[in-house]
Amino acid sequence: MQIFHNLNEWIRFRNTLSPDLSLGFAPTMGNLHAGHASLFLASSKENHYTVSSLFVNPTQFNNPDDYKHYPRTVDADLELMTQNGVDFCILPNENEIYTDGYAYQVQENRLGQLMEGKHRPGHFNGVLTIVMKLFNLVKPTRAYFGEKDYQQLLLIQGMVKALFMDIEIKSCPTVREKSGLACSSRNNRLTPSQREIADEFAKIFHQNKSSAMISKELEALGITVEYIEEFQGRRFAAVKIGDIRLIDNYLL
């Protein structure tokens, strides 16, 4: 795997690649897990080359503590990428990415105001802006996103369509641990007792019951329920176990 620490180096290299070659892209913030590996493998099966990025994007954290405590595990992340078919990895720094001083942002005013957007103001502006920047840098044929962040997936699909971007957005199923808990970088921050509660969250959330009943059962375990909502045939949830925030969704 070839690693690019400098954006100008990447841009020069990208310009040498034949337009006849397909590029798959799976952007990440690091602290990788099996869910990320599934994106890399899906891309490597469908493209000549697979590109990823490691960048903890400050603009999508509405809570500064979340950004501060987000695990940085670069060496382990690069190893996982190497083992799962990534050919090129971009590791930009904040000054390179935001040369405009955060002056320009991508904003969506409908779906982005619901659920995650309602509870994390500004989050999706940060997501869409960094994804747009990375798309312009990588110029991928296809880009891969997990269904765990399904609202994010819908927004990226909508952005690509609205702005006439010639990129195929591929969705990949949520990867789950044996308990049914969705793989997430935040799972690493759970204490053993919190992890048991998180496993119960996954089981209860997937029960064939009303959202109100599910909320009641979760709250009885001491879980803080931010929302459980149904949207476009899926059920979405965001909860807190202690100070760890977890999200999930599934097709009804």
From Swiss-Prot:
Pathway of this protein? Cofactor biosynthesis; (R)-pantothenate biosynthesis; (R)-pantothenate from (R)-pantoate and beta-alanine: step 1/1
Q: Which residues bind beta-alanine?
A: 60
Question: For this protein, what reaction is catalysed?
Answer: (R)-pantoate + beta-alanine + ATP = (R)-pantothenate + AMP + diphosphate + H(+)
Q: Nucleotide-binding: is it a keyword of this entry?
A: yes
Q: Which InterPro entries match?
A: Pantoate_ligase, Pantoate_ligase_C, Rossmann-like_a/b/a_fold
Q: In which compartments does the protein localize?
A: Cytoplasm
Determine if Iron is one of this entry's keywords. no
* Gene Ontology biological process terms in this record: pantothenate biosynthetic process
Gene3D superfamilies xref list: HUPs, Pantoate-beta-alanine ligase, C-terminal domain
A family per Pfam: Pantoate_ligase
Its chief place of residence is cytoplasm
* Source organism superkingdom: Bacteria
* GO terms assigned for molecular function: ATP binding; pantoate-beta-alanine ligase activity
Misc note: The reaction proceeds by a bi uni uni bi ping pong mechanism.
Task: Tell me the protein's name.
Answer: Pantothenate synthetase
**Taxonomic source organism:** Legionella pneumophila (strain Corby)
Supply the gene name: panC
